[in-house]
Amino acid sequence: MSHHGGAPKASTWVVASRRSSTVSRAPERRPAEELNRTGPEGYSVGRGGRWRGTSRPPEAVAAGHEELPLCFALKSHFVGAVIGRGGSKIKNIQSTTNTTIQIIQEQPESLVKIFGSKAMQTKAKAVIDNFVKKLEENYNSECGIDTAFQPSVGKDGSTDNNVVAGDRPLIDWDQIREEGLKWQKTKWADLPPIKKNFYKESTATSAMSKVEADSWRKENFNITWDDLKDGEKRPIPNPTCTFDDAFQCYPEVMENIKKAGFQKPTPIQSQAWPIVLQGIDLIGVAQTGTGKTLCYLMPGFIHLVLQPSLKGQRNRPGMLVLTPTRELALQVEGECCKYSYKGLRSVCVYGGGNRDEQIEELKKGVDIIIATPGRLNDLQMSNFVNLKNITYLVLDEADKMLDMGFEPQIMKILLDVRPDRQTVMTSATWPHSVHRLAQSYLKEPMIVYVGTLDLVAVSSVKQNIIVTTEEEKWSHMQTFLQSMSSTDKVIVFVSRKAVADHLSSDLILGNISVESLHGDREQRDREKALENFKTGKVRILIATDLASRGLDVHDVTHVYNFDFPRNIEEYVHRIGRTGRAGRTGVSITTLTRNDWRVASELINILERANQSIPEELVSMAERFKAHQQKREMERKMERPQGRPKKFH
């Protein structure tokens, strides 16, 4: 490079990239003297360099530099700083030292070559070394690490440039755990103890023999149970067959039950109440519409009112109910108001509702919070709600909350709930994900479930299956709607919001009064649609799976599955919207070839519920099985048969 007025051209310092034809290799860290012994052949640059061959770079030749270059390694993350903005830094070094500097960039270190007289080479290197040293000092002062850029030295004296030098302090995980436990104890130390056991067994319940109790459970939907406590198992309490057996000591609860007109507890209530009233954590697995809400609400009311710390000062929430959807949250709040006890105040907190109004209600002081995880987590992170005094926690429809991806929000919420609380979990199914959640957040629970553990075949619903085509689905539904009587009430389930809107529009154009319920509608519109359906103003509701849980309308006579749900569990939940509270119901489901993957599972559900199975459905299941076998055979044929032999 020629000099004009002492300033080198910018092209001199442009970073080159040296790569071999196979693999990139970092330059060897050799002393400058050793590298300087390399002749003209030694500084030939590879494919990415600025020059080739055995000659010096043209800029160095033009400048009259006869000495061999001074070569040294530079950490690649310093290259940009050494060059400077627009090359300003390295131009200044070249100008003040009358040298030509070449940087060949590689990882983790780059090769620097300085051309010029020996004195100027040494001066230029000293300038670069001092500049890099200042960069290291600045970094170390900010990070508090004084060995960040120095190579570690092994026992044999070798260096490893990829390992930070110096003795690293070992992390004592046991100490960290101990400190975490101490912090937890300190966090909850000022809270009063919780009273949990409020159960007084009636004479009739205590007189029931084990044989009688087992016989009752078998006759009432085959109730089974398990104690998940480690070690010695606890005996399950006898079921409370009447409301008096459960709440004989709580006349106000009995009065509310009589006002509601209930005759006797549902099976899940009879078995769950003696457990929860004793303060034992509970997992209740049963189909929707079996009275699971009152399983936890009634004992929860008693739990709250009889806490010593709450007498005369209920200004902070003591009970928290988490639900997957706003519809279910509103339904639970409705039940709280219906069975109001001792002036307990509740608030419903959910996404889509007026956030400011919900905050104002919380500020007034409440006893019970019913919430969806997303909105409650939002208010929690904004310090609008204090969960420190929660002593009674409910995870309602836990399987649905996990399906909807709420586990991270649940985890954050429960960090602020005292660990010695009482917890009740309800679920329609018992998959591994719910089992794992129970292990994390419940302590030594008992599990009570109605029917089988995997799925509950709804025996109170007559299930009709129609195997058809996509083109014929609309006409089948029209035929059904035209055959409805004036007292029938139907929920039509569809897979997508757009389908719900499309069907609603077509039916309204045909002078058929309908309402639709899905997530894209405004909250007030959804509430109005649900109210119109409940009161009978409209008798046809078109809904997505959002409404397949928490939709509590007792007089639904039919469920029509226009689209088959994404899995067989949702099918069970959908048809569970009818045949509730001791009534019978009817479901109609249309299937097309697109649904043939679920045909076999659907047959199992129908068989367990003693339903008729159409031949077309059996044929569909057989075709899908044959299709799967064919694909598996094709995959096997495509796989290489063993390893190729090696010949020596």
Swiss-Prot record:
| Assigned EC number | 3.6.4.13
In this chain, composition skew of type Basic and acidic residues spans 26-36, 628-641
Superkingdom of the source species: Eukaryota
Please describe the organ and tissue distribution of this protein's expression: Expressed in testis. Expressed in many tumors of various histological types at a level that is 100-fold higher than the level observed in normal tissues except testis.
KH domain ranges (all copies)? 67-128
Task: Report whether Nucleus shows up as a keyword of the record.
Answer: no
Q: Between which residues do disulfide bridges form?
A: none
Span of domain Helicase C-terminal: 460-621
Compositionally biased residues, Low complexity: 10-25
Motif (DEAD box) positions are: 396-399
Query: What UniProt keywords apply to this chain's record, in alphabetical order?
Result: ATP-binding, Helicase, Hydrolase, Nucleotide-binding, RNA-binding
Motif span (Q motif)?
Answer: 242-270
Q: Does the keyword RNA-binding apply?
A: yes
Which Pfam families does the entry link to? DEAD, Helicase_C, KH_1
Q: What class of enzyme is it?
A: hydrolase
- Residues binding ATP: 286-293
Residues forming the Helicase ATP-binding domain are: 273-448
> What reaction does this catalyse?
ATP + H2O = ADP + phosphate + H(+)
Q: Which residues form a coiled coil?
A: none
GO MF, one example: RNA helicase activity
Homology family? Belongs to the DEAD box helicase family.
| Family matches, as PANTHER family | ATP-DEPENDENT RNA HELICASE DBP3
Q: What is this protein called?
A: Probable ATP-dependent RNA helicase DDX43
This chain's source organism reads: Homo sapiens
Q: What is the lineage of its organism?
A: Eukaryota, Metazoa, Chordata, Craniata, Vertebrata
Query: What's the name of its gene?
Result: DDX43
